[in-house]
Amino acid sequence: IRGLTQASANAQDGISCVQTAEGALNEVHDMLQRMNELAVKAANGTNQEEDRSYIQSEVDQLITEIDRVSTTTTFNEKMLLDGTFQNEELQVGAEGVAGNQIRISISSISSDTLGVKDLEVDGPDGSKAKTAISTIKNAIKTLNKQRSDLGAIQNRLEHTIKNLDNVVEN
């Protein structure tokens, strides 16, 4: 029974880890949404080149912040979003058989892997900004895929905990 109780606690740790990553991905999503808003603004023909340069400054700051989040998001001193959190095993059963482990992998989420590292919205016309809009949309799709994968893992862990708690109780 103690082994099963610990397995349940391990699964709960896994949920906490996933929630930490998800919280950071949520922030990155918000930054990408803001970048999209800025790109749409920069694409407007009423802007001057100087206006677009100011918009570019904010975009550059958002890119820097995405990378900061990528390199500083941790759980129990393990980096989560820099691409090194791969095939981490959670022991969710009392025995060491293969079916009692759940693996978690989190892709690198940085301005580079999202394709926005060199995003440009400045210039004399809105052409760079128009290109940036589709680049940002693709980045959001990539991010949403990772968020979906993490959500599925969290759901699986929640069901695992319910089952383990039921076994312990009975």
Q: What do the PLM-derived regions correspond to, one by one?
A:
Residues 1-170:
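Primary detection of the long, small/polar-rich alpha-helical "axial" segments characteristic
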